Swiss-Prot record:
Source organism of this protein record: Gallus gallus (Chicken)
InterPro entries, per the entry: COMT-like, O_MeTrfase_dom, Plant_O-MeTrfase_dimerisation, SAM-dependent_MTases_sf, WH-like_DNA-bd_sf, WH_DNA-bd_sf
Protein name: Acetylserotonin O-methyltransferase
Catalytic activity reported: N-acetylserotonin + S-adenosyl-L-methionine = melatonin + S-adenosyl-L-homocysteine + H(+)
Any single Pfam family the record assigns to this protein: Methyltransf_2
Active-site residues (renumbered): 256 (proton donor/acceptor)
Binding positions for S-adenosyl-L-methionine per the UniProt entry: 148, 165, 211, 236-238, 253
Enzyme Commission number(s): 2.1.1.4
Pathway membership, UniProt: Aromatic compound metabolism; melatonin biosynthesis; melatonin from serotonin: step 1/2
Lineage: Eukaryota, Metazoa, Chordata, Craniata, Vertebrata
Length: 346
């Protein structure tokens, strides 16, 4: 970053300052249905047609489409009768609602929830606490009461998490051979995408999603196919209620929500419940040991500040938490993607 070129003209600083504009362009195009319309049409469409079908102004849509072209989310063909737009392949795969790898729901969660919390990042840094109260006018003392403040918000969050596991789930579940573990509890399993991937990869296992009652109800009714008999549900709060015996406990993006004290409390209960020879699989975005990256994880850790009571950690920090609970033979696997895997054995 400190090259002579950067010092003469701070291009990278300008890129950083425009970062939130880039995000909002993508979020807005998703929300308005630009990518879905172009996928469904099966052919490039003109500005006038896109604006008319999506009920927007021509002037506003033109600028949005051109920005998407600049970001390589759309491609444009200049014809005699004007500009015609189509999706790029990456948009077809990840930004349309109907794609199996769609990230639409997490985009909407970021746009409507995360984006608003980050407006108060300065306050979060000053105070060292999340910003639900400022962003939404609701108490943040009950973290998941705030996060699941309405059924619509809860569904948005759960569907968003499911979308992440549609592209990252296989990597974290195959980082280790989990076939010896036949009875698995997915603590805080939410919308069930990771559980579904687990029973697909390991057909001899059963997975029980352990989550709050209202989460379980939504997952049962709207997110997990009823014909999938290898997935069961357990309603409860794992900080207050008992954890049943099992061979393996999956905690995916759970510990990063909490401070070290709460993590030690939860892992101690998991260790008590775990069968001898069993284990716990942590799925988290790992910081490098010198905390110099990855930048995505550093940003996620700030997001934990504005939204939760937790933080992202290094592999050593997670290993120490597991060791304090009694787990041994801790192994770490970096996937090269957003989320990594840490396995501890009893």
């Amino acid at each position: 970053m400190d090259s002579t070129e950067d010092l003469d003209y701070p291009q990278i600083i300008f890129q950083y300052s425009n970062g939130f504009l880039v995000s909002k362009v993508m979020f807005t195009a998703c929300e308005l249905g630009v990518f879905d319309l172009l996928l469904q049409s099966g052919r490039p469409l003109s500005l006038d047609v896109i604006a008319a079908r999506l009920g927007t102004s021509i002037m506003g849509m033109e600028r949005l489409l051109d920005a998407c072209v600049g970001l390589k989310l759309l491609a444009v063909e200049l014809r005699r009768e004007g500009a015609f737009y189509r999706n790029t392949e990456i948009s077809n795969i990840y930004l349309t609602k109907s794609s199996p790898k769609s990230q639409y729901h997490i985009m909407m969660y970021y746009s409507n929830t995360v984006y608003l919390c980050w407006h108060y990042l300065t306050d979060a840094v000053r105070e060292g606490r999340n910003q639900y109260e400022r962003a939404f006018g609701i108490s943040s003392k009950d973290l998941f009461g705030a996060r699941y403040r309405s059924e619509e918000e809860m569904l948005k969050f759960l569907a968003g998490q499911n979308s992440i596991w549609s592209i990252c789930g296989r990597d974290v579940l195959t980082a280790f051979d989990l076939s010896p573990f036949t009875q698995i509890y997915d603590l805080g399993g939410g919308g069930g995408a990771l559980a579904q991937e687990c029973v697909f990869l390991y057909p001899n296992c059963t997975v029980t999603i352990y989550d709050l009652p209202k989460v379980v109800q939504v997952a049962k009714e709207r997110l997990v196919p009823p014909e999938e008999r290898r997935i069961a549900f357990h309603e409860g709060d794992f900080f207050k209620d008992s954890i049943p015996e099992a061979d393996l406990y999956i905690l995916s993006k759970i510990l990063h929500d909490w401070d070290d004290k709460k993590c030690r409390q939860l892992l101690a209960e998991v260790y008590k419940a775990c069968r001898p020879g069993g284990g716990v699989l942590l799925v988290e975005s790992l910081l490098s040991e010198d905390r110099s990256g990855p930048v995505e994880t550093q940003l996620y850790s700030l997001n934990m500040l504005v939204q939760t009571e937790g933080k992202e950690r290094t592999a050593v920090e997670y290993s120490e938490l597991l060791g304090a609970a009694g787990f041994r033979e801790v192994q770490v696997r970096r996937t090269g993607k957003l989320y990594d895997a840490v396995l501890g054995r009893k």
